């Protein structure tokens, strides 16, 4: 069997771990109807992991494609979700928390882009 045949299994297992980390972080951070801190935190954590580990350190060290796929697509994909960002956005909109909504979108999208940009420029 070729090692490429095991890539989906590695992605699957790493995604389960990423989802578990997401759940544990959401139970660790206090829930607030005013602002979705948990989603923002795990999305920033996912950006850091994706850029630092997958785009920087692991590629630089010549890590296998399977491990990079497992961590990037699997773990980071399970850790971060666009759907949670949208769900939190709709909740803030439905409850009339417009300032929190704008702040959340600015921090999520703008902050995420800035974090990815600056981490991506760094030479690991």
UniProtKB/Swiss-Prot annotation:
The chain crosses the membrane at residues 9-29, 34-54, 67-87, 99-119. Keywords: Cell membrane, Ion channel, Ion transport, Membrane, Metal-binding, Sodium, Transmembrane, Transmembrane helix, Transport. One of its GO terms (biological process) is cellular detoxification of fluoride. It catalyses: fluoride(in) = fluoride(out). GO terms for cellular component: plasma membrane. One of its GO terms (molecular function) is fluoride channel activity. Na(+) is not transported, but it plays an essential structural role and its presence is essential for fluoride channel function. InterPro entries: FluC (IPR003691). PANTHER family: FLUORIDE EXPORT PROTEIN 1-RELATED. This is Fluoride-specific ion channel FluC 2. It comes from Streptococcus pneumoniae (strain ATCC BAA-255 / R6). The lineage of its organism: Bacteria, Bacillati, Bacillota, Bacilli, Lactobacillales.
